[in-house]
Amino acid sequence: MWPFAPVPAGAKCRLVETLPENMDFRSDHLTTFECFNEIITLAKKYIYIASFCCNPLSTTRGALIFDKLKEASEKGIKIIVLLDERGKRNLGELQSHCPDINFITVNIDKKNNVGLLLGCFWVSDNERCYVGNASFTGGSIHTIKTLGVYSDYPPLATDLRRRFDTFKAFNSAKNSWLNLCSAACCLPVSTAYHIKNPIGGVFFTDSPEHLLGYSRDLDTDVVIDKLKSAKTSIDIEHLAIVPTTRVDGNSYYWPDIYNSIIEAAINRGVKIRLLVGNWDKNDVYSMATARSLDALCVQNDLSVKVFTIQNNTKLLIVDDEYVHITSANFDGTHYQNHGFVSFNSIDKQLVSEAKKIFERDWVSSHSKSLKI
């Protein structure tokens, strides 16, 4: 790439989806399987993966991706998979299946032991990257609805790799003093692009606050700012909205995002559509929150639907001008404690494509009224 070449619109980002086979529509976008396969096929030096857990062998397509990684590692490509210390259940089986892949467990909050690694992203050769809500599991690759972004624009991939370096510094096998020193070395150079300096209309946001480095944007600050500044429309497709934070088994009210949605509907007359998931992984407060929003804003332009098939898509669109794709729920525990990276864009084409996905999901036969 020429050093003074113009930045491509949208930083060469393409939307990526996993759609279960039992859905009544198909995607026009790259599939998660195709995305991961391309990253592996084109890799020459390294592939770095961050995911809460690692269970690719649970589906046929997931197993195919893991076999491709195994082949790449046997050819000398450096492969590191970061996973949370509490998500390592399948680690022994995977290590025996492929000893050349380096699996590293991390604990991003050894002091309080409440934070998890939620980030779902891949980076290869400082040239290609994926970020979204597909963890490195067979379900995310094949049977659970997910949404992410793939880019082969090197500056963006390099910026995401900085996040990998940050999470890697919290290797749970190291002692706390080494963790702190390592983190201190990588955090000051943790980002090049942010809300005030996007590249091609694209930037990343980060969580939690104690992992922020120089010029990073806190994800919750950006999300709430966008919700508070919404003028015409807010479209949300999420597994759950939970206005609480859980610590040591106790729940504490965390209304920041919840209140911002209500204020937009009641105070400013913003049209809001909320599509929530409804499956066994939902927080107990999730459906109660959806019903409370529906009831409280009954005199306003706020609609709530429930998606009946396993849906881990986490998407926010504001005023048809901004899109946010993340791996975290709008959940106080996630935003206060967990480590993740979100994708943000004001590029018109990317926002338009994300909007079409939301519209498709909203009118599909899988979306049911909350009142039914």
Swiss-Prot record:
Membrane topology type: Lipid-anchor
Transmembrane annotation, as ranges: none
A GO CC term attached to the entry: host cell Golgi apparatus
Motif (YPPL): 153-156
Enzyme class: hydrolase
Pfam families documented for this protein: PLDc_3 (PF13918)
Swiss-Prot/TrEMBL induction comment: Expressed in the intermediate phase of the viral replicative cycle.
GO BP, one annotated term: viral budding via host ESCRT complex
Reaction catalyzed: a 1,2-diacyl-sn-glycero-3-phosphocholine + H2O = a 1,2-diacyl-sn-glycero-3-phosphate + choline + H(+)
EC number: 3.1.1.-, 3.1.4.4
InterPro entries named among the record's database cross-references: Diverse_PLD-related, PLDc_3, PLipase_D/transphosphatidylase
UniProt main location, coarse: virion
PTM (free text): Palmitoylated. Attachment of the palmitate moiety is essential for correct intracellular targeting and protein function.
Assembly, per entry: Interacts with protein OPG190.
Entry remark concerning the domains of this protein: Late-budding domains (L domains) are short sequence motifs essential for viral particle budding. They recruit proteins of the host ESCRT machinery (Endosomal Sorting Complex Required for Transport) or ESCRT-associated proteins. F13 contains one L domain: a YPPL motif, which might interact with PDCD6IP/AIP1.
UniProt function note: Major envelope protein that plays a role in the biogenesis of the viral double membrane and in egress of virus from the host cell. Produces the wrapped form of virus that is required for cell-to-cell spread. Acts as a lipase with broad specificity including phospholipase C, phospholipase A, and triacylglycerol lipase activities.
Entry's family note: Belongs to the orthopoxvirus OPG057 family.
Name recorded for this polypeptide: Envelope phospholipase OPG057
